[in-house]
Each structure stands twice: as C-alpha cells, then as structure tokens.
C-alpha cells in the first residue's frame, strides 16, 4: 500500500521490515508471518496502524507450512540477491559476532 512499509497482500500485512543504525553498524530485518496466532494479533495494532489487519503464508496458501522449508527458501533467495552462498553457524557464534560489532 502506498506510504506504508512492509509487504501487503491486498489490505492485509504479511511482512514487517525495519532498519536501525547504531555506532556505525546497521541492523536490519524482517518478520514474515508464517502461522501466527491471530487471537494475539487482535489485541494489537500492527506497526501502530489502527484498522489494518495481518495475514500469513499459511492462511493464504490454505495449508500448513513447514518452517524449515521457509527458512531454507529465504536463505537461498537472500543468497541469490547478495551473490553469497548461505551458511549455518550456531547461536553462540552468532552472538559473539554481534557483540564484537558493538
């Protein structure tokens, strides 16, 4: 939707995106709704947008979606965009890298 950040399917938001810069380090990310609990979403306004609703990959596809498949697909597509080969690291190593960046 014009003027609104994120990814929208019709009038419903399926993905939020954000960026921040602290101490010369950029932080960026997105939140893709795969199979959220919509009862929880009824209690908040997504990104402060009153009267807007969220949707999900599962709701739009009409069947359960495997989170592992989603993660692999996103990693593959991100690798294509950035001309990189996706690699896995454990959580401890990730936190170490993040701390060193601060």
Go through the PLM ranges and name each one.
Residues 1-102:
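Catalytic beta-strand/loop module used to bind and position nucleotide/cofactor moieties
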């Amino acid at each position: 939707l014009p003027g609104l950040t994120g990814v929208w399917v019709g009038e419903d938001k399926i993905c939020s995106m954000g960026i921040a810069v602290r101490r010369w380090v950029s932080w960026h990310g997105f939140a893709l709704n795969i199979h959220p609990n919509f009862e929880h979403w009824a209690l908040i306004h997504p990104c402060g947008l009153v009267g807007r609703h969220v949707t999900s990959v599962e709701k739009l596809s009409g069947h359960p979606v495997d989170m592992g498949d989603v993660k692999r697909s996103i990693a593959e597509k991100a690798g294509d965009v950035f001309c990189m080969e996706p690699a896995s690291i454990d959580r401890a190593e990730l936190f170490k890298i993040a701390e060193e960046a601060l």
